[in-house]
């Protein structure tokens, strides 16, 4: 009989504590890439909504790789990114205790769906948010505040909100977040932020193909889970008294308390997580009917698969396609940020050459890429049906 091992590395990382539900549904972006004054002023983050996953076929162009000049199939995630609206500017002063906000400048008009974010129940509220601001708005006072930011501040950020009315989701309240302006001098940053007030910003003005980005979001909620699923500890033998899906020993006699490092049952999922260095494979236009076409597949087809993305629907706006998976379930709002750690390895610098994007149905085993291809296979003629209905 072989001997048993009496030592093993601990199960469950201590770097992700406490494992409880996050207070923020949207990914919080509390740090931004390092500023480079030599570049032009630009925004560093955006928001998107997870639509679903599919797969692509591409040719690897990375010398030294064993897959170089070969075709590979990779999983990708499609994130719908409707345009965001800039409604404010915030200036920060760098103090010994960190950044401190000097003042906030709001645009003249604020969308009602944005005002709803300041109330728990918009229908039963007095709806007085920003009424005094809009009634007594003064352009000269706004310019004075912007000059004050230009004089005293070292960090400039804009206040942006999503446009939920452009999405087919139940959520109607717009998500609000701050986006840092990097590049140029402070005066150029303030002028750039002022030029964006009350205007829509599209995702292709911030991110580009072959770029690396970070994804900040909240994971899927799993509810109350035991130690086997929550920490991955090994279950006990089958003859163990009073259950075997548990921890055999929760600690010594003394100290006479349970340490925080001991795996215990509790909340699993709905945690805030940051995934770094995701490769952008495509930045697509929502109004382009052939935004899923490639050089190797010239078929006119959209990124939405047949039948729509499961539990999401049709992608009608601009979108970003990134390599691999990302946090959260379908419809979860994600914060996309420019990579905070510059990457210089071969995979980061590789130019992506897509040959094929799969748009078959994700409900079951899809075999057709377009509706026309499916109709041709089954011998259907949709023109006759349309003529019959018109008669």
UniProtKB/Swiss-Prot annotation:
GO terms for molecular function: RNA binding; structural constituent of ribosome. The keyword Ribonucleoprotein applies. Residues 1-41 are annotated as: Disordered. Coiled coil: none annotated. It holds the Pfam family Ribosomal_L3. Residues 1-10 have a biased composition (Basic and acidic residues). It comes from the Eukaryota. Keywords: Cytoplasm, Ribonucleoprotein, Ribosomal protein. SUPFAM superfamilies: Translation proteins. GO terms for cellular component: cytosolic large ribosomal subunit. Gene3D superfamilies: 3.30.1430.10, Ribosomal protein L3, domain 3, Translation factors. Residues 17-31 have a biased composition (Basic residues). It is found in: Cytoplasm. One of its GO terms (biological process) is translation. Its main location: cytoplasm. InterPro entries: L3_arc_euk, Ribosomal_L3_dom_3_arc_sf, Ribosomal_uL3, Ribosomal_uL3_CS, Transl_B-barrel_sf. Belongs to the universal ribosomal protein uL3 family. The L3 protein is a component of the large subunit of cytoplasmic ribosomes. PANTHER family: 60S RIBOSOMAL PROTEIN L3-RELATED (PTHR11363), LARGE RIBOSOMAL SUBUNIT PROTEIN UL3 (PTHR11363:SF5). This is Large ribosomal subunit protein uL3. The gene is RPL3.
């Amino acid at each position: 009989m072989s001997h048993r091992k009496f030592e093993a590395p601990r199960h469950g990382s201590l770097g992700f504590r406490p494992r409880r539900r996050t207070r923020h549904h949207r990914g919080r972006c509390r740090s931004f890439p390092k500023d480079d004054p030599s570049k032009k002023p630009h925004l560093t983050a955006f928001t998107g909504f997870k639509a679903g996953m599919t797969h692509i076929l591409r040719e690897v162009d990375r010398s030294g790789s064993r897959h170089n000049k070969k075709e590979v199939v990779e999983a990708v995630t499609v994130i719908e990114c409707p345009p965001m609206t800039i409604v404010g500017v915030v200036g920060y002063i760098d103090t010994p205790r960190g950044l401190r906000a000097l003042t906030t400048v709001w645009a003249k008009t604020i969308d009602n769906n944005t005002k709803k974010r300041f109330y728990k129940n918009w229908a039963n509220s007095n709806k007085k948010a920003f009424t005094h601001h809009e009634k007594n708005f003064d352009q000269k006072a706004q310019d004075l505040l912007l000059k004050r930011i230009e004089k005293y501040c070292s960090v400039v950020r804009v206040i942006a909100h999503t446009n939920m009315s452009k999405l087919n989701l139940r959520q109607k309240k717009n998500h609000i977040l701050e986006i840092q302006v990097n590049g140029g001098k402070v005066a150029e940053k303030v002028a750039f932020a002022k030029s964006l007030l009350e205007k829509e910003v599209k995702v292709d003005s911030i991110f580009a193909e072959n770029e690396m980005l970070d994804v900040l979001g909240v994971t899927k909620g799993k509810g109350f889970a035991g130690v086997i699923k929550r920490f991955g500890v090994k279950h006990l033998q089958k003859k163990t008294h009073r259950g075997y899906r548990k921890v055999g020993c929760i600690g010594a006699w003394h100290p006479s308390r349970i340490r925080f490092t001991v795996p215990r049952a509790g909340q699993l999922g709905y945690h805030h997580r940051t995934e770094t260095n995701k490769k952008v494979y495509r930045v697509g236009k929502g109004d382009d009917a052939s935004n899923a076409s490639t050089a190797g597949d010239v078929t006119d087809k959209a990124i939405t698969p047949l039948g729509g993305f499961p539990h999401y629907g049709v992608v009608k706006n601009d979108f970003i396609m990134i390599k691999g998976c990302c946090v959260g379930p379908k419809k979860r709002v994600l914060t996309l940020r420019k990579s905070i750690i510059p990457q210089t390895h071969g995979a980061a610098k590789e130019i992506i050459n897509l040959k094929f994007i799969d748009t078959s149905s994700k409900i079951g085993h899809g075999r057709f890429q377009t509706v026309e291809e499916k109709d041709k296979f089954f011998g259907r003629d949709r023109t006759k049906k349309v003529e019959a209905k018109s008669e």
